[in-house]
Amino acid sequence: DSILTAPMKSVCLNGTFVEPAKLADPLSMLERNHLFQRIHTFGGTAPFLSVHLEILTRALDRLYGMQTDLSESRIADRIARLLEINRFPRQSACVTLRLFPEGIDEGSDRCEYLIETDRPLLYPHFVLWHKRMMLDTVRCDAPHEGYPTAAALLCDRYAERTVRRRGGELAARESRDGVLLGVGGEPLLIVSG
């Protein structure tokens, strides 16, 4: 996703900062099985990092029967440093933490992680806002629905492309039973009244 499109000076691979151009083919990386979390940062820090790491840890255990030793303080430090290196605004940004249970390269025998800056966010704090959009739904179930997997990411991309071809702006993915699953890879938040 963003490895392919976002201009970055550096990414963090297993705690080491490297230039994206020095990575193996980014497209093949995204095609490998991986779990991910998009993390909103404020003031250069990730305020709910422990929750994101817990989600990844649980998913890794349930889907792969593996444990991880991701240190919250080390990941927090790497996120802050990565935002600084890539000159992201201090107010609000989004980073993606990807966990590759089978490693990034063929033949790897260990779980690896990648942190990348995703995009600056246009609001300074948690804000509810609205925009009138043309929304359309696409039926597409991902294996292990509800977990942040590469398959779910590909299903979201498929839904977005399908809706754009139909002339819409935003894709809501739904299950074969008609249950809304999310919009653009993000959970749904509905406010009524």
Residue ranges with predicted function:
Residues 1-81, 102-193:
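Helix-start/capping segments and mature chain N-termini
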Residues 82-88:
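Phosphate/pyrophosphate-binding loops at sites that engage ATP/ADP/AMP, CoA/4′-phosphopantetheine
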Residues 88-99:
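Ordered, amphipathic secondary-structure segments that act as subunit-interaction surfaces
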